[in-house]
Amino acid sequence: MTQQITLIKDKILSDNYFTLHNITYDLTRKDGEVIRHKREVYDRGNGATILLYNAKKKSVVLIRQFRVATWVNGNESGQLIETCAGLLDNDEPEVCIRKEAIEETGYEVGEVRKLFELYMSPGGVTELIHFFIAEYSDNQRANAGGGVEDEDIEVLELPFSQALEMIKTGEIRDGKTVLLLNYLQMSHLMD
């Protein structure tokens, strides 16, 4: 069912790094009643993420980096273990994720497989993330990784079983990473 939505006002509150909108809109309900809503929406662009796995070694490549939003929300160190990811900017998702993989992990991946696209926080964030997996091997290591410019990224090659256990212990708390690790487990690619 399509609901009627009428934009009343879109005020930009900030466009420092990303864009924060204050949006006023009317939503016509199924019964015909029109309800006015006022919401803040954070537009950070769309992104892509990839989980690198090695079925023979039963390992995955993740990264650890400082994430200020987690630090503000009580993650004492601000460090987060996650899959390689980045904003699309003007790139296609596959182009973006290949670039991010080599910058962040040092691996120049071959065939990548797109799994799905998901909104991770649709109540207030516009971002749509494209999810990928790719098998990696040691001979695809082009550099040490670690990111670019102001990034300080640690590359982690972990046994797959340990990564799954780290979800249970709370060491891995990033949503996209949990989704991709669980997908890998359910797909039986590591069996």
Swiss-Prot record:
Its EC number is 3.6.1.-. Keywords: Hydrolase, Magnesium, Metal-binding. GO terms for molecular function: hydrolase activity, acting on acid anhydrides, in phosphorus-containing anhydrides; metal ion binding. One of its GO terms (cellular component) is cytosol. SUPFAM superfamilies: Nudix (SSF55811). GO terms for biological process: nucleoside phosphate metabolic process; ribose phosphate metabolic process. It catalyses: GDP-alpha-D-mannose + H2O = alpha-D-mannose 1-phosphate + GMP + 2 H(+). Its cofactor is Mg(2+). Mg(2+) 1 binds at A85, E104. It is an enzyme of class 3 (hydrolase). Mg(2+) 2 binds at E100, E104, E151. GDP-alpha-D-mannose binds at Y17, K38, R39, E40, R67, A85, G86, L87, E104, E127, D150, E151, K176. Residues 43-180 form the Nudix hydrolase domain. A motif (Nudix box) lies at residues 86-106. NCBIfam families: nudix-type nucleoside diphosphatase, YffH/AdpP family, PRK15009.1. Belongs to the Nudix hydrolase family. NudK subfamily. In the dimer, the N-terminal domains are swapped between the two monomers, such that residues of both chains contribute to the active site. Nucleoside diphosphate sugar hydrolase that hydrolyzes GDP-mannose as its preferred substrate, yielding GMP and mannose-1-phosphate. Homodimer. This is GDP-mannose pyrophosphatase. It comes from Shigella flexneri.
